[in-house]
Amino acid sequence: MKNTCGILLNLFLFIGCFLTCSASNTPKVQVHSGEIAGGFEYTYNGRKIYSFLGIPYASPPVQNNRFKEPQPVQPWLGVWNATVPGSACLGIEFGSGSKIIGQEDCLFLNVYTPKLPQENSAGDLMNVIVHIHGGGYYFGEGILYGPHYLLDNNDFVYVSINYRLGVLGFASTGDGVLPGNNGLKDQVAALKWIQQNIVAFGGDPNSVTITGMSAGASSVHNHLISPMSKGLFNRAIIQSGSAFCHWSTAENVAQKTKYIANLLGCPTNNSVEIVECLRSRPAKAIAKSYLNFMPWRNFPFTPFGPTVEVAGYEKFLPDIPEKLVPHDIPVLISIAQDEGLIFSTFLGLENGFNELNNNWNEHLPHILDYNYTISNENLRFKTAQDIKEFYFGDKPISKETKSNLSKMISDRSFGYGTSKAAQHIAAKNTAPVYFYEFGYSGNYSYVAFFDPKSYSRGSSPTHGDETNYVLKVDGFTVYDNEEDRKMIKTMVNIWATFIKSGVPDTENSEIWLPVSKNPADLFRFTKITQQQTFEAREQSTMAIMNFGVAYHYQNILNLMCQMT
């Protein structure tokens, strides 16, 4: 009996000690709105880092806050549990077609840090990097991208954020009642939160780099030109997209918002009544209404997205992006060798090539997003035929011409807008702008992920692939491959040196030539090859990455627009 009691006593003492020790080891941080308790994670090579997940940076955008600019976060009592991610914002699950996921209460961010201030005897603050997720402004969430490669050997504080998506994030009545761009204003609120609170995690608010891919890249570029974002960051990394890409600025958003109001049984003649009525409708019904503007296979990319604000007290986009002056900070811009490959791959699934071939005139204006730009049906069809002749000649759309389809999408959707953004920023700024083309194709590929049968190493890197070698993307298997590990190290070095100094890869600075400040000069960029070499290149904009094709295509559109 005594032995049994002794064993039980020791067991209770062990449990008590375990619970006490666990509680004492819980990382805690005090921010302006309250205390936060986080957890631990491990980087790619096993470094222990702190993680604080699901931190609210604004009040929930629900009920009367729906369709409002982000409201200040309210202080909480007790300790906020930051060991689990906050909900994604309501959006469409990528690849599902029509499934709505997430919650309306979604304005959360995640912070990762290798050390807290009390562990830093020198008191040095760390560089901060903020990642803005992509997803066409209608899907995605911050937690999908982790710093598990980036923080292996670098002392950075990493932040990822959620922001409102689709109709809930980008609806507009075209006036001061609902000016639009609330999703981007959410991002501004997150950047302001970082300025106020990041020191508590060991981060330096005066050394913030923002980065994003695709719609995240468009977001970063928009912050670079928005007066609302000035002074909130110090460097920018823009991957595979820009505010100059056609899909980055949504068209006819006010008319689309009225359409949704009518669809959900709301008035359509008065902006106040539209907004008040839509606030009473189920959030998921509003989110799902987005699909009415994607008539074929989730095209066009962004029916609801950034829009020029014609009214409002403080405008995020007071004019079209091309007319706004960028903030004078270092910028690193990149593009993948075959941006359009992932999209042509999706289009080829489930008999898509035949559907596109048989309905080219109807589908192409949505794929390339000029259905609203050219309102005249005959001119839209003529444009479709001109583009088909230019890219395909007399060949049908098929597996054999998949590369032609990829090139067409690359030129229109990414090549033209991204190169013009680099030239525009360089011409306006004194700070350097660097541009590179990512040409490495390994196992970390979106084509390999979604259609492994069509993929082979060394083929072509596509939209978003390079991000997989800097950030750990949720759902991707970590391959134990020597070449891919080497590329991870290479890409992390490019980012890390730029984050620290504003210059990428400082050991090879002679290869990284800034984009010329004179748009008439040769376009300077660095090519990262399949062999993982770096090549400094200077070419005419008409030649680089088929930009000549892009200009030809753009001229077709410009001509058609002038005729309408």
Curated annotation (Swiss-Prot):
Q: Which SUPFAM superfamilies match?
A: alpha/beta-Hydrolases (SSF53474)
Catalytic residues as annotated in Swiss-Prot or TrEMBL: 214 (acyl-ester intermediate), 339 (charge relay system), 463 (charge relay system)
Task: Please verify whether the record's keywords include Disulfide bond.
Answer: yes
Q: List the disulfide bonds.
A: 89-106, 266-277
Q: Which reaction does it catalyse?
A: a carboxylic ester + H2O = an alcohol + a carboxylate + H(+)
User: Which terms in the Gene Ontology molecular function aspect does this entry carry?
Assistant: carboxylesterase activity
Lineage, top-rank taxon, reads Eukaryota
The region annotated as signal peptide is 1-23
Pfam families linked: COesterase
Q: What is its EC number?
A: 3.1.1.1
Keyword annotations of the record: Disulfide bond, Glycoprotein, Hydrolase, Serine esterase, Signal
Q: Does the keyword Amino-acid biosynthesis apply?
A: no
- Glycan attachment points: 81, 269, 371, 404, 443
Q: What else is known?
A: This esterase confers insecticide resistance.
Q: What does this protein do?
A: Overproduction of nonspecific esterases is a common mechanism of resistance to organophosphate insecticides.
Q: Which family does it belong to?
A: Belongs to the type-B carboxylesterase/lipase family.
Write down what this protein is called: Esterase FE4
